[in-house]
Amino acid sequence: MPPLTWLGTITPQPIGSDQDQLAMRDLHRPCLRLILGDQLNPQHSWFHAVQPDVIYVLMEVRSETDYVLHHAQKVLGLFAAMRDFAQQLKVNGHRVRYISIDHASNRQDVVMNLDALVQHHKVNAVEYQAPDEWRLDQDLRNWVPPSPVTVRMVDSEHFFTERDEAQQLFLGKKQWLMENFYRHQRRRHQILLTPDGKPEGGQWNFDADNRKSWPGQPAEPADTRPCHDHSALWKIIESAGVKTLGESQASAFRWPVNRTEALQQLDHFIERGLPHFGDYQDALSQHSWRLFHSLLSFALNTKMLNPREVVMRAQTAWQEGHVPLHAAEGFIRQILGWREYVRGMYWAHMPRYTTSNQLAHTRPLPHWFWNGQTQMACMASALRQSLTQGYAHHIQRLMVIGNFALLAGLDPQELHRWYLGIYIDAFEWVEAPNTLGMSQWADGGLLATKPYVSSAAYIHRMGDHCKTCHYDVKARTSDDACPFNALYWDFFDRHRSHFQTNPRLGVVYHQLKRMPEQTLQELKSFSVRTLSNLENL
């Protein structure tokens, strides 16, 4: 095999007396350590000391760019961050082998490249950090090297919990309540607790205080993220034939590509965003796509940042009086609670989880999911932002895009692939439970106690899109009626067998029971017309 791209080869350094064991190793048969694109953690114990007989391997491969159609910024951001990480390893004295997307000897598959590297370097061992996606985990577990070598998986040293911790906690339980998991984690890690182990403020959850719409003040914090020119890298990606969606913004790329930049973004959020995050975390605005959100998810999910340091920074900000308790608690709940919880859900139920479709929804996604060309102002705003920025905050994903998709009966598998591709922070372990569980109820209620849907009233209450929308937020069956309204009632009527005994939906079915039959039939007829005309909404 011709040599692959080398980003770093070092001359072995003199070995001190404390490294006698290392000196005994056969330097002609090195250990290969694989670093995946979402494992860019410079604090991992792997990197504590330079080991001349260890070669770190990173690779840009089509098997990773092509399993779904990814956003341009996602591919560009991952490649840029991987290259930055590899270069820093080289600067620190490590041996690095970097396989670029356009190299002639790149076999465009993780395992196939490992085969070639094992033979080329005559390695005696291959180590890899535990993958976060089931697909890669299976590929590496089932890999049979071309020659006898020791293959070892190590921990990624990132999460608060083990893969199976949530499963053990909920053993024998029909439903896994996130709130129970969250309280367990708060106690275990001593977060926002009084000296006697009670929750600070007298309650575990301040979600009721985090539901304000944003009137335009206080002002959104300035966007202080880095600005990179990755035009040259983008040309390489395009020339390699990688297909993407959305805008690359390669000449002014705004996402962090290393830990230093991620820490600067964390500092800025704690100082400027977190004080108002609690009040407006559920707000929608057509005038601002960032509001007070941290924009840390890409850095967290690629492991540039550690969730412990993020949680501790938020707790310290509250302890020092810089942010209100409900802001700190709401943010910590997302990291310590929700993020760890959905990871546990993912590993407990894969691989069947990503094929779930409890409500048997099969309607294709309309074409405007790929261009944002719809007259529904809230959907157009969220979709266009997603295509432009590669990002949408959780309410846009859940209560705008996901809400419409569930009401309209869109295929959850196709929607899952769309979410997995379009967002820069989307990796299957975190995206699939959010999409198939929380958003689409495709898992039959394993994750969510009820479907998260609403009529137009919620979107109107939390945002400002309805003021300028083509559709009438209050109308239900007129020609200009907002599609959310009739679809909402039609959804609960056609899925009575799933939801009418759910105690959390008692009010909904009480209203349906009291609704005149003619009114219900008008709503259902309107829904039929709407669903037959999805492409033109």
Where are the regions a protein language model picked out?
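C-terminal catalytic domain of photolyase/cryptochrome flavoproteins
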Residues: 36, 264, 283, 287-537
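Beta-rich, aromatic/charged-enriched effector core domains that present basic-aromatic interfaces
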Residues: 109-255, 436
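A short acidic (Asp/Glu
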Residues: 43-47, 68-70, 108-111, 136-142, ...
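A eukaryotic "domain-start" boundary segment
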Residues: 64, 188-299, 480-485, 497-537
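A structural signal for the main folded, soluble domain(s) of proteins
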Residues: 94, 101-103, 116-120, 125-126, ...
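N-terminal beta-strand-loop-alpha-helix module at the start
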Residues: 4-101
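Gly/Ser/Thr-rich loops at beta-strand to alpha-helix junctions
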Residues: 39-41, 105, 130-138, 406
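Short His-Asn-centered micro-motif
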Residues: 34-38, 59-60, 99-101, 128-131, ...
